[in-house]
Amino acid sequence: MSAPALPDRDALHRSIDSVWRIEAARIIACVARMTRDVGRAEELAQDALVAALEHWPQDGLPANPAAWLMTTAKRRAIDHLRQQALHQREH
């Protein structure tokens, strides 16, 4: 059995761009609620977008790209909050 066919790179980037335009504000708002910092939320959401640009060409478009981006951004936010808490404990 062969692996599923991956979409061509241009089509994939158009799909990523489309999902990002639709979901970016929602992702940033969710992460901003977690971090209480809109600027940091924008950075973390963009980190999730970069991760998609790195992973999706190899792995293919996930079944629910919006959920993938949201989950990745939330995980980045959790990592950030943990690092921030650790830094505060050290000082």
Q: Language-model features: where?
A:
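Active-site-adjacent bridging/hinge elements
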Residues: 2-3, 46
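A short, charge-rich alpha-helical start-of-domain segment used by transcription regulators
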Residues: 4-29, 39-42
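Hydrophobic-face residues of short alpha-helical interaction/recognition segments
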Residues: 27, 31, 69, 73-81
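Short amphipathic alpha-helical interaction patches enriched in hydrophobic/aromatic residues
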Residues: 31, 35, 56-60, 77
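Short, small-hydrophobic-rich alpha-helical interface motif
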Residues: 41-52, 69-72
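Sigma70-family region 2
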Residues: 47-65, 83-85
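Short, basic/polar amphipathic helix motif occurring as a linker/hinge flanking DNA-binding modules
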Residues: 80-91
